C-alpha cells in the first residue's frame, strides 16, 4: 500500500483569532499547502512543451504529472515514459516544475495543444472543446467483477486511516485504488479532488498496475471530471462518500461504469451498473 508519508512542507502553521461563547481567543491552526505546478513534456530531443499549470498539494508530483498527461491524451501507454525530471526523492517537484520525457517512437501530440491552467477545484476548466473532453473516454470492457457490499462500506474507513494530511488540516481530498476484494493499492491526497485521482492513476501507470478490475474511492462528490479520469484509465467502479452529478450518472451508464455514492456507515446508493454488486 502506497501513500504520502512525508509531511514536511505540506502544511503551514497560522496564527488566528477564534471566537466562541467566551469571546475572542488567539489560536494556531495547520493549513494545507497549495502551490502551482507546471507540467511539461518533451518528445525525444525536441524542445519541452508546457501541458499546463495546476494548483496542487506538493507531494507525489511525479504521479500527478503522469496521471495528468494521461488524462489529457498526451500519454497513452506507460511504455511511452522515458524518464521524469525535476522530482525529489520525497516526490516534490524542484522549482515547481516537472518534465516527463516521452519515447519519440511512441509520442505524439496535438500541434495546437495549448497550455492550460487548472485550479484546485476544477479538473476540466480551460479545455478547448467539449468534443475534446469526451474524445478519450471509451466503454469499459465487459468483466465478471463481483464486489461484496461489506467491501464497499469498508473502503472509506480504510482510506480515511491513510489520510495523514486530512487528519492534520481537515482541508484535503483523497483518492484510493482498491482491488475488488478490498485490498488497498495506493492512496493519494491533494487539495484538489481531481489531482488526487490523477495521482493514483499516475502511480498505476508508473508501476504497471492493471486498473481494469479495480475500484476508485474518492473523498468528495462524484462529478463529471472524476468519472472522466476513471473512464480514461479503464477503472470500472467508482465509489464516493458524497453525491453524484446528473452528467456523472449519464456517462457511467453509457460507458459501463458502476457508480456508487453516499457510502456511509453500512449503506450506499448504486446509480449505475449494479450487476457488479453481490446481492
From Swiss-Prot:
Q: Name one GO molecular function term.
A: sulfur carrier activity
Q: Which InterPro entries match?
A: Cytidine_deaminase-like, FdhD
List GO BP terms, alphabetically.
Answer: Mo-molybdopterin cofactor biosynthetic process
**Is the Cell membrane keyword given for this protein?**
no
Q: Which UniProt keywords apply?
A: Cytoplasm, Molybdenum cofactor biosynthesis
* Active-site residues (renumbered): 122 (cysteine persulfide intermediate)
Q: Name one GO cellular component term.
A: cytoplasm
Q: Where in the cell is it found?
A: Cytoplasm
Q: Which PANTHER family match?
A: FORMATE DEHYDROGENASE, SULFUR CARRIER PROTEIN FDHD
NCBIfam families, per database record: fdhD_narQ
Q: What does this protein do?
A: Required for formate dehydrogenase (FDH) activity. Acts as a sulfur carrier protein that transfers sulfur from IscS to the molybdenum cofactor prior to its insertion into FDH.
The similarity annotation says:
Belongs to the FdhD family.
Q: What is this protein called?
A: Sulfur carrier protein FdhD
Q: What is the lineage of its organism?
A: Archaea, Methanobacteriati, Thermoplasmatota, Thermoplasmata, Thermoplasmatales
